[in-house]
Swiss-Prot record:
Domain of life, source organism: Bacteria
One GO cellular component term: cytoplasm
InterPro entries named in the record: 4pyrrol_synth_GluAld_NH2Trfase, Aminotrans_3, Aminotrans_3_PPA_site, PyrdxlP-dep_Trfase, PyrdxlP-dep_Trfase_major, PyrdxlP-dep_Trfase_small
Protein name: Glutamate-1-semialdehyde 2,1-aminomutase
Compartments in which it is found: Cytoplasm
GO terms for MF: glutamate-1-semialdehyde 2,1-aminomutase activity; pyridoxal phosphate binding; transaminase activity
Keyword field: Chlorophyll biosynthesis, Cytoplasm, Isomerase, Porphyrin biosynthesis, Pyridoxal phosphate
Needed cofactors: pyridoxal 5'-phosphate
Gene name of the encoded protein: hemL
């Protein structure tokens, strides 16, 4: 393996110990602290292609990809070159730039639901704005979200949220007023009957339904056949909006996102990660008649100092250009399918219960008998055994998400040799923890 079993992380340990006196929990996003897998987190020094190097010089095959953006591989040379050229013109204008038009046209041409788009600085910002827009357009205040679906850390969405909230075992967050979440209704993912019941109880007050079309923040959970179609029918019946949070799936499971992959067009879509090519970015878009509610075209206010900045736009444009090349998604699909199937085969060979799946460049597995169709069923995952697996994989040079409740990501940079090495590490690690 690339990294020796006697993993030396002395510099990482020292830096994280110091960081805990400087930043809450020593990190700037909770999942990075390794709380659910134990041990000290790995401090990275640099990344390139499919690999990450820590400050102690250990190299890892990376399957978090900066939590999704690095679909073309870390530090892709063409993206870096484009950014270097853009840097000579300045980092932020605080005024319109031509690059915004270019990326907006690319997004509109790619994503079926998007007729107009607004760029922001994060997925959280995009989801905050889209919720305000849902309410402004419909004149209704309630919204339905799904248990385990994560839409950023805004107050109104921290109800039965996934991602770091699930990792830390928090039902919600202190500091969120009950009045803020009173209009947030929740249903189990993949449960159309629960959604129908909520609409029956609140026929004239639900502005819409927001969901991850493929859940990635409660582990990897795909939609049941007919689930997305059912949501489209129900929302139309009640005059409510359907919103796909494609921050994770956008441009990852197909060039047009989950909506293009499954053939279901929502009214609004949120995006992020891939469209910024590794720089901070978010976006929301949809039908023109709805988007024209957004200021200054309409009365719904939303703004941002760094929104549409030239560096994020440049990285996004180049990334989408790379993704549009022939054969891109076929390669991603084949690479990820081989990895996901190999993981399950390795677990079963070790006598461990396992279930999992993949779609294009996104995958996941649970250490339990499946199938897992929602967040409640995901809790059957053996988190204690996963923690041991995570450490064993680190010692064998593979960096997995440090949580049972996060999807994994592949990239165009992952080679057949990388997958071979990863599966060998899984085989050894599963035998070790069985």
């Amino acid at each position: 393996m690339v990294t020796a079993a006697a993993l030396n992380t002395s510099r990482s340990d020292a830096l994280f110990t110091a960081a805990q006196q400087l930043m809450p929990g020593g990190v700037n996003s909770p999942v990075r602290a390794f709380r659910s897998v134990g041990g000290q987190p790995i401090v990275f020094d640099r990344v390139e292609g499919a690999y990450a190097w820590d400050v102690d010089g250990n190299r890892y095959i990376d399957y978090i990809g900066s939590w999704g953006p690095a679909i073309c591989g870390h530090a892709n040379p063409e993206v870096i070159e484009a950014l270097q050229q853009a840097l000579t013109k300045g980092t932020s204008f605080g005024a319109p730039c031509a690059l915004e038009n270019t990326l907006a046209e690319m997004v509109i041409n790619a994503v079926p639901s998007v007729e107009m788009v607004r760029f922001v600085n994060s997925g959280t910002e995009a989801c905050m704005a889209v919720l305000r827009l849902m309410r402004a357009y419909t004149g209704r205040e309630k919204v339905i979200k799904f248990e385990g679906c994560y839409h950023g850390h805004a107050d109104m969405f921290l109800v039965k949220a996934g991602s770091g909230v699930a990792t830390l075992g928090l039902p919600d967050s202190p500091g969120v007023p009950s009045s803020t979440t009173a209009n947030t209704l929740t249903a189990p993912y993949n449960d159309l009957e629960a959604v129908k019941a909520l609409f029956a109880e609140n026929p004239d007050s639900i502005s819409g339904v927001i969901l991850e079309p493929v859940v990635g923040n409660a582990g990897f959970i795909p939609p049941d056949f007919g689930f997305l179609e059912g949501l489209r029918e129900i929302t139309r019946e009640y005059g409510a909006l359907l919103v796909f949070d494609e921050v994770m799936t956008g441009f990852r499971i197909s060039y047009g996102g989950a909506q293009a992959r499954f053939g279901i067009t929502p009214d609004l879509t949120t995006m992020g990660k891939v469209i910024g090519g590794g720089l901070p970015v978010g976006a929301y878009g949809g039908r023109k008649d709805i988007m024209e509610m957004v200021a200054p075209a309409g009365p719904m206010y939303q703004a941002g100092t760094l929104s549409g900045n030239p560096l994020a736009m440049t990285a996004g444009i180049k990334t989408l250009e790379l993704l549009k090349r022939p054969g891109t998604y076929e390669k991603l699909e084949a690479t990820t399918k081989r990895l996901a199937e190999g993981i399950q085969e390795a677990a079963k060979a070790a006598g461990l219960p396992v279930c999992g799946n993949s779609i294009s460049a996104m995958f996941g597995f649970f250490l339990c008998d499946g199938p897992v169709r929602n967040f409640e069923e995901a809790k059957a995952n053996d988190s204690e055994r996963f923690a041991k697996l995570h450490r064993a994989m680190l010692e064998r040079g593979v960096y997995l998400a440090p949580s049972s409740f996060e999807a994994g990501f592949t990239s165009l940079a992952h080679s057949d040799a990388d997958i071979d090495a990863t599966l060998e590490a899984f085989r050894e690690s599963f035998q070790l923890i069985a």
